[in-house]
A protein has these predicted regions:
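N-terminal sensory and localization modules of signal-transduction and trafficking proteins
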Residues: 14-16, 43-45, 51-54
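Long, intrinsically disordered low-complexity tandem-repeat segments
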Residues: 629-690
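Eukaryotic nuclear, charge-biased low-complexity tracts
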Residues: 55-56, 203-204
Length: 696
């Protein structure tokens, strides 16, 4: 059936059918997007055959793998996702490692449970003809382990360690120990699926046993280190994920010294075809390429202003001035830098910037929709680390010669609904006001702001693209990254030419909004002196004493992009005069003072009970049960979801601020989330198997 099946152009003004072998649309020239998806459930391997077209849309390319031949159309989604599927949705903040649910194919027979759920992984390795390089989408960790460098191998293990606690909280950590689920997508560790933990959930001893099997084919200069590390894990001497992460961080810093990194940065901005003035801003200054040698720390920022009476332009420029001043990009040679230390620096700078804009709003008596604010994306590199920070819906993409991954998750209503487990992402973005922001810089106090700062490891040539939605809307990056940005990595174009080409593309293909772009091009070469093998005892001695002084409590933790979702007001419905980029007030954390007050109250209550007991007087008051916290209702139809009840009421957040220059609601993210690793779980997180399903 391949010979007669066509691939639809994703350009909404074209939608022409094309041969499956085409790379570009024959009619409009748009690069054709090939989305390969994984069908959940082993039963589909025998029920559907290669070459078969399912639901007049999904072409079976391999057992359990289909190609979406109509990528411009929204996939089907149920009114309410089944409860077992919510694990994937709630793990959206970890989309670089865990697949997201693309959609589903309803059962052809209502009497049988034969619904097919589809998973997407971002960029999949393809050959020049657009066909799969690996017959099961991605290679297993074991398949490619022996071919990787020492730094890449430590990098993969570090990613597994970082995922341990988040997956443990969801009772799917056994996924990391399943060799068939633990896959690799270039530099990223990705899970093919999630699998449920058994009654006896795995612990770090099991992780140590899994890693022991990798030692014989590990890079020679990390084998001794891994032997000692796995022995400590299996013996139980190393029993905390944070200690394991710290040791691997030390190893990353050590082996990262075996490479030198230089950077080129280029920024550009344009008003667009439909706007009268430009409310975007960026850093460094536009239209001049900047080269940074090894040891210099690059900083790039893009802001997209929001607010009436030219307030957005003021907010964006104020953010650029403050952040570039607060963050010191000077070299840090001969200074010992601890892992994640710059995360705190960046987050603090973002909070300072937020309060300066908020105070400006208050000084100018800006209320409700006249308050000004701005989105933010920022990239800052230190040694082998790239820190990616964001607030709002501007985006960062991580591009290599073979992959493009969206690093950030938009701070909008659509993403919020997904993280709450209510809607599939590609369904959520179809709703009115789906692109309304849930937070932006300057709308209220920094106490209500939750910036996301992620730490990425650079071990190969790559490009970080920072952009406002003037470029990213309508999946333009997903369509054009390979043809427009990869030539930079091949040495066929320079960074200036690529930046100018992307800006021109934004105006030609979108043009509805201001467009701003920052390119951070990183070149990686071997260091003049190779690194010596790391001695495990050295890493442990340097790291563990510091960690033993800390008491870790993960009960209230949030992770990159994961928000406290108990106080997000819902904006009013969109109207002809209200932009989709309305910005509701930010999230609210419980004040530390409230926590202290509660603790003091509990201690006082215990003291009173003790006194009554000693006095032989029975307690006169009944036990106190806290009232349950009301959760938000699922979004259905076109009605925005009800706001979640704040557990700490008392402050009324300001009304949403609207961008006075109406834009368009962004479509699906340019790249779907990327998967991670796995273990042999007892039961996969899937729906029930169809009863005796057989093909006609």
């Amino acid at each position: 059936m391949d010979s007669v099946t066509t691939l639809q152009c994703q350009n909404l003004t074209c939608l022409s059918p094309n041969a499956l072998t085409n790379r570009f649309c024959e009619k409009c020239g748009t690069p054709l997007v090939k989305r390969y998806l994984w069908m959940m459930g082993d039963w589909v391997r025998t029920y559907y055959h290669v070459g078969e077209l399912i639901d007049n849309r999904y072409l079976v390319k391999q057992p359990q793998i289909v190609l979406d031949t109509k990528p411009a159309q929204a996939p089907q989604a149920p009114e309410e996702p089944p409860s077992w599927l919510s694990l994937y949705l709630k793990l959206l903040p970890f989309h670089l490692h865990i697949p997201q649910v693309y959609g589903y194919i309803p059962s052809p027979d209502e009497r049988l449970n034969m619904d097919i759920w589809l998973l997407e992984y971002g960029t999949i390795p393809l050959d020049q003809t657009g066909e799969l390089i690996y017959p099961e989408l991605l290679p297993t960790l074991a398949e490619v382990w022996s071919q990787a460098s020492d730094l890449r191998q430590i990098h993969w293990l570090w990613q597994m360690a970082k995922l341990w606690h988040p997956l443990q909280r969801k009772a799917v950590v056994s996924s990391l120990l399943n060799p068939s689920l633990t896959r690799v997508n270039n530099q990223l560790l990705q899970l093919l699926e999630l699998s449920k933990d058994e009654a006896n959930a795995p612990n770090l001893k099991d992780l140590g046993a899994f890693w022991t099997g990798l030692i014989p084919t590990a890079a020679a200069n990390i084998q001794d280190f891994l032997v000692s590390l796995t022995q400590e894990l299996e013996s139980g001497d190393l029993d905390r994920p944070e200690s394991l992460i710290a040791i691997l961080d030390y190893a990353l810093q050590h082996y990262g010294g075996g490479q030198e990194r230089s950077y080129e940065i280029f920024t550009c901005t344009d008003t667009g075809l439909m706007r009268e003035h430009n409310e975007d801003a960026c850093y460094p200054p536009t239209n001049q390429a900047i080269t940074l040698a090894h040891g210099q720390n690059p900083l790039a920022i893009v802001c997209d202003g929001i607010g009436g009476q030219e307030g957005g332009e003021i907010a964006a420029q104020l953010a650029i001035e403050t952040l570039s001043r607060e963050i010191n990009p000077s070299p840090t040679t001969n200074i010992e830098v601890y892992p994640d230390s710059y995360s705190l620096v960046l987050e603090q700078a973002i909070r300072v910037t937020n309060d300066l804009i908020s105070q400006r709003n208050d000084q100018e008596s800006r209320q409700d929709r006249q308050r000004m604010g701005t989105t933010l994306v920022m990239a800052f590199a230190q040694a082998q680390e790239m820190y990616a920070a964001h607030v709002g819906d501007s985006r960062i993409y991580w591009i290599t010669a073979h992959s493009c991954h969206q690093v950030t998750v938009d701070d909008d209503l659509a993403s919020r609904e997904v993280k709450l487990g209510y809607l599939l992402y590609r369904d959520a973005i179809q709703y009115p006001n789906a692109g309304a922001l849930v937070q932006a810089l300057g709308m209220s106090s920094a106490n209500n702001l939750h910036p996301t700062v992620q730490r990425l490891i650079i071990d190969q040539d790559c490009v970080f693209l920072l952009c406002s939605d003037g470029l990213s809307d309508y999946d333009r990056v997903e369509q054009y990254w390979d043809s427009e940005i990869v030539p930079l990595l091949r040495g066929e174009k320079n960074v200036t030419a690529v930046g100018e080409s992307l800006l021109q593309l934004a105006n030609q293909k979108n043009g509805h909004d201001n467009s701003t772009i920052a390119l951070v091009y990183c070149r990686v070469v071997p260091a003049a002196e190779p690194v010596t093998p790391l001695v495990y005892a050295e890493a442990k001695e340097r790291i563990i004493p510091d960690l033993n002084d800390q008491d870790f409590d993960h009960s209230g933790d949030t992770y990159p992009g994961e928000e406290v979702v108990t106080a997000i007001p819902t904006p009013p419905p969109a109207s002809s005069s209200v932009s989709s980029r309305t910005s509701p007030p930010a999230l609210t954390r419980v004040s530390p003072l409230v926590v202290v007050a509660i603790a003091v109250g509990v201690l006082g209550l215990l003291a009173a009970i003790a006194w009554q007991f000693l006095s032989h007087n029975p307690p006169s008051n009944p036990p106190i049960s806290p009232a349950p916290v009301t959760g938000p209702s699922p979004t259905t139809g076109t009605t925005p979801p009800a706001p979640v009840t704040d557990t700490n009421p008392g402050t009324t957040p300001p009304a949403p601020v609207t961008d006075t220059n109406p834009g368009t609601t962004p479509p699906a993210p340019v790249t779907g989330p990327s998967p991670t690793t796995g273990t042999t779980p007892s039961a996969p997180v899937t729906g029930p198997s169809p009863p005796n399903a057989s093909p006609n």
